[in-house]
Design a protein with these regions (language model features):
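Non-cysteine beta-strand/loop elements that form the S-adenosyl-L-methionine
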Residues: 12-20
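Active-site-proximal beta-alpha core segment in soluble small-molecule metabolic enzymes
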Residues: 1-9
Length: 219
């Protein structure tokens, strides 16, 4: 906030994502399950800081699943919630049909935090362990090829040329192509990578967005 304040800008909102989210997690692998990092424990200090800068709205994310969850965080002072997995499993979602069905089939033990091998970004990465690309990565069946370049790191000259998967394939695997495939792109060329939040195991059917919104609003 201080940086943007100096430039004359004020954030429209801040999104606080807890460790139950899908995909990349902003925590060290050893800190993902700490009690202190639970969303409800992180929220108060973030809300207090947002208040100091003019009551910037705080939106919470990661593990929000029910109407009761939404009400709980609204009562704590959240301006809103951000939800991914629940809307992924809707009729209108652009996710591939195989992705949606993988979510419906997923059990608690099927949802894991990938780390070694993991994302070339170096962050813990929550995924369905049966994801075709993840299975291949564990067996190092897919040779890394960085033809998208979305998560390249800087080299000694400050240019984005370093691919973690190419540099250390035993520790990292390509994710860009797999994520695109899970969204229905290049499915004939690339295996899919299914990222979900921990509560994906509760999804038992594909809903319409209208049905989901009625459920989430408590109507």
């Amino acid at each position: 906030c201080k940086k943007w304040e100096k430039l004359g800008y004020r954030p429209d909102a801040v999104v606080l994502e807890g460790p139950l989210a899908g995909g990349h997690l902003g925590f060290r692998i050893d800190d993902v399950e700490l009690e202190s990092n639970k969303l409800e424990n992180l929220f108060p200090s973030v809300k207090d800081m947002a208040m100091k800068y003019g009551d910037i709205p705080v939106i919470v994310a990661g593990g929000i699943y029910t109407h009761e969850d939404i009400v709980h965080y609204q009562n704590m002072g959240a301006a809103g919630v951000q939800m991914g997995t629940r809307f992924l499993a809707t009729e209108e979602s652009s996710a591939s049909e195989s992705f949606k069905q993988a979510v419906v089939a997923a059990k608690d033990e099927d949802i894991v935090v990938a780390h070694r091998p993991g994302s070339p970004c170096g962050l813990p990465f929550r995924v369905i362990k049966q994801s075709p690309m993840y299975v291949s990565s564990l067996k190092q069946l897919r040779k890394p090829k960085c033809d998208k370049g979305y998560v390249l790191q800087r080299d000694a000259d400050g240019k984005y040329t370093v691919c973690g998967a190419k540099e250390s394939n035993e520790n990292f695997f390509c994710i860009c192509n797999g994520l695109l495939s899970s969204g229905g792109y290049n499915t004939d060329k690339e295996e899919a990578l299914y990222t979900v939040g921990t509560n994906a195991s509760h999804v038992d059917r594909i809903l319409s967005v209208k049905e989901l919104m009625q459920e989430l609003s408590g109507t």
